[in-house]
Amino acid sequence: MNIAWIITDEFIGKLNNGDTETILRWNKILYLRMATGKGYFTKIDTMNRNKAQVFKNLNLKVHASNLCNEVNLPANDEYSFTCVIINANLTLWDSFPKHLFHVLHIMQDCNVSNYIDILNKKTGINAIFLSKVKKFTEDFRAVGTGVCGWHSLLMQKHLVYGSMESMLLNEQIFSRMQADLNEANVWLAEVLGVPEGNKRAGIMLRNATTMMMPPTKSSAELSRNSPTESINPETALIKVKESVGGDLLRINTEFLKLMKEKGMYNDNEVERIMSNKGSVQDCDWLTQHEKDVFRIAFEIPMSAHLDLCSQRQRFIDQQQSINLYFSGSDSEEYIAQIHKQALLDDNINGLYYCYSSRNGRYERNDECTICQ
């Protein structure tokens, strides 16, 4: 079971003002999150400020996200939201055809139609149980295109995570996604019509929403080039992945290319990197720039990660499943500071998992790459 803390503007205000009871509760929250990795942050007032215009116009309130943390849709006595997702593999970004996002959006709308057809065939208790789901899907046809392989793409282009170049690419990708998906949404409305909920809101679009960033933990493993998960950073460049069929050795695709280019792909080097928890900062055959490019999540400034998430949220009408990563080298003050950054940023709707590497000690590069 996954749970979330509902964090309000009032709570954030009290925390900023130094309220003793609020600080004690905050410390308990951080302790539990670091101990278990769980307890999502649901900034409910922020989510309602940032929800899609359709739901603002109808005054439909968002109460929570989903089992992950990328959904920002309302639910009430009449509606239960549905989660319709498709993802683009960013390792193929440079070869994306012109109308890829248009096609992805149309595919999702087809999925919605198919889902409604299935629900229409339900009878008896099943029909009653799914009636609120069916009503929401029919009225709003909310969908969300996401991505996997964000960090893989940065490595592919030899861009440092959090650098000015990475921010420019971030802007380029997600602004294009928003524009293309909106074009497809308008076209579908003209060709196939506008659902009743959107009509009531005065929004003449086929789909109430178009974008969200789900975790893609499983789908990324099955995708071409083995991209990194969603918009989150790589946790280890070489690692053993446990599976039902046994343990599998996983080497980051972009780093494997570099190893082969430099003639360093051998068992000894693989074992050495694995013994360093997938970090390559001790590899003397890498240049400093290459070491910076291939920093793993526990070495990347979490402030830079949040900055990139905040930047792209302007283009996303739902939200992102944002993970944070901390190691044994990180102080309690640093962990609290990063979480507070997420609380205070109105473009961060919430937080997903918190990963910790208790046995690994990493040197986190906490200097702003843009300022260097």
Predicted regions span which residues?
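Conserved, charged catalytic cores of large soluble enzymes
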Residues: M1-L60, V147-N198, Q319
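Generic recognition of stable, solvent-exposed alpha-helical segments in well-folded globular domains
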Residues: N2, I6, E10, E21-K28, ...
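Short coil/turn segments at secondary-structure boundaries
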Residues: N2-I6, L24, Y40-M47, I116-T137, ...
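Conserved alpha/beta enzyme-core scaffolds, especially Rossmann-like or related mixed alpha/beta domains
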Residues: I3-F11, Y115-G149, L154-Q172, V293, ...
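Function-dense linear segments that define catalytic or interfacial modules
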Residues: R33-T137, G149-L154, N225-E254, L258-K260
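Catalytic alpha/beta core of large soluble enzyme barrels
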Residues: N69-A75, I116, M211-Q372
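Internal maturation/activation junctions in enzymes
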Residues: F101-K134, E138, H158-T216, Q288-D292
